[in-house]
Swiss-Prot record:
The active site is at H331 (proton donor/acceptor). It comes from Mus musculus. It is found in: Golgi apparatus membrane; Secreted. It comes from the Eukaryota. Glycans are attached at N50, N74, N119, N204, N219. One of its GO terms (biological process) is protein glycosylation. GO terms for molecular function: alpha-N-acetylneuraminate alpha-2,8-sialyltransferase activity. This is CMP-N-acetylneuraminate-poly-alpha-2,8-sialyltransferase. Residues 21-359 are lumenal. Its EC number is 2.4.3.-. InterPro entries: Glyco_trans_29, Glycosyltr_29_Sialyltrsf, GT29-like_sf, Sialyl_trans. Residues 1-7 are cytoplasmic. Disulfide bonds join C142-C292, C156-C356.
């Protein structure tokens, strides 16, 4: 009899704890959404910041249910966010260094490893743009396309391609996934590690031909290569530069300024979003606020399952695994997503995580 009462007591306490945690999550979400105030600043409470990852980890993706139906752009908020970001960086300028920034033979320190240096090669210098590739460019609608497997079976391809300007990340493949991700690419990032992971480190002619073919599809698009972040990828950058020059590819290369990543991080930290290093997706959204009137995000989903409990791949195009909540990760993607979700609900951007309506 005593053991039965003990089990009932434990069960009752467990139910009360679940009820309390559910109420806590609801209150936290409600509080966060009321914190987007003056000057476009995203002011998150200290308690939310400190508990954010814990809450997200326990509740999973279920706390991020938002609707795209009835979504409306909040133009005044968009303008205030742009104005606030301009206090930290000017994307038109910081999106790339230009030829006049360096001369061949100059030695610079890596952005995230100041003890190590890089020599500006002749090939690299020859590919630096004369002026910013985003100078005086403005667009009504932009799509920033992440690489989450949430895009698979979304049917978002046509909607993505309908935007005036499409930004993609890490040279992700598009042709074989066109129905879900589209093919239009106006600005595409490429971490040096992509050379090894997706193109075999250019070990043979077939790998090099595959890479050249991929870049030839970009035509006059901007290829954004973060060449100055950390030591280790410099040989890949040089190989890429050499192939572009040898094959006379028409892609427009860009290499982010030495201050960009710290300026972007500074903006979010000042607005009480304690990121480590901004992910490529968050970085692209931050830059896009400078030249896009309306920003739509696709392929952003830093969780292993969707809202229905179905497994979601880290990348839509490969089987790479990622531990979203690992302290060893340089990013805090769930926290970034939580922030973007708040901005969606306030009309600053549109975040699509489900199926797209047929056009």
């Amino acid at each position: 009899m005593r053991s039965i009462r003990k089990r009932w007591t434990i069960c009752t306490i467990s139910l009360l704890l679940i009820f309390y945690k559910t109420k806590e999550i609801a209150r936290t979400e409600e509080h966060q959404e009321t914190q987007l105030i003056g000057d476009g600043e995203l002011c998150l409470s200290r308690s939310l910041v400190n508990s954010s990852d814990k809450i997200i980890r326990k509740a999973g993706s279920t706390i991020f249910q938002h609707s795209v139906q009835g979504w409306k752009i909040n133009s005044s908020l968009v303008l205030e966010i742009r104005k606030n970001i301009l206090r930290f960086l000017d994307a038109e300028r910081d999106v790339s260094v230009v030829k006049s920034s360096f001369k061949p033979g100059d030695v610079i320190h890596y952005v995230l490893d100041r003890r190590r240096t890089l020599n500006i090669s002749h090939n690299l210098h020859s590919l630096l743009p004369e002026v910013s590739p985003m100078k005086n460019r403005r667009f009504k609608t932009c799509a920033v396309v992440g690489n989450s497997g949430i895009l698979l079976d979304s049917g978002c391809g046509k909607e993505i391609d309908s935007h005036n300007f499409v930004i993609r990340c890490n040279l992700a493949p598009v042709v074989e996934f066109a129905a879900d991700v589209g093919t239009k690419s106006d600005f595409i990032t490429m971490n040096p590690s992509v050379v090894q992971r997706a193109f075999g480190g250019f070990r043979n002619e077939s790998d090099r031909e595959k890479f050249v073919h991929r870049l030839s599809m970009l035509n006059d698009s901007v290829l954004w290569i973060p060449a100055f972040m950390v030591k280790g990828g410099e040989k890949h950058v040089e190989w890429v530069n050499a192939l572009i020059l040898k094959n006379k590819l028409q892609v427009r290369t860009a290499y982010p300024s030495l201050r960009l990543i710290h300026a972007v991080r500074g903006y979010w930290l000042t607005n009480k979003v304690p990121i480590k290093r901004p992910s490529t997706g968050l970085l692209m959204y931050t830059l896009a606020t400078r030249f896009c009137d309306e920003i739509h995000l696709y392929g952003f989903w830093p969780f292993p399952k969707d809202l229905n409990g179905k497994a979601v791949k880290y990348h839509y195009y490969d089987d790479l695994k990622y531990r979203y909540f690992s302290n060893a990760s340089p990013h805090r993607m769930p926290l970034e997503f939580k922030t973007l979700n708040v901005l969606h609900n306030r009309g600053a951007l549109k975040l699509t995580t489900g199926k797209c309506m047929k056009q």
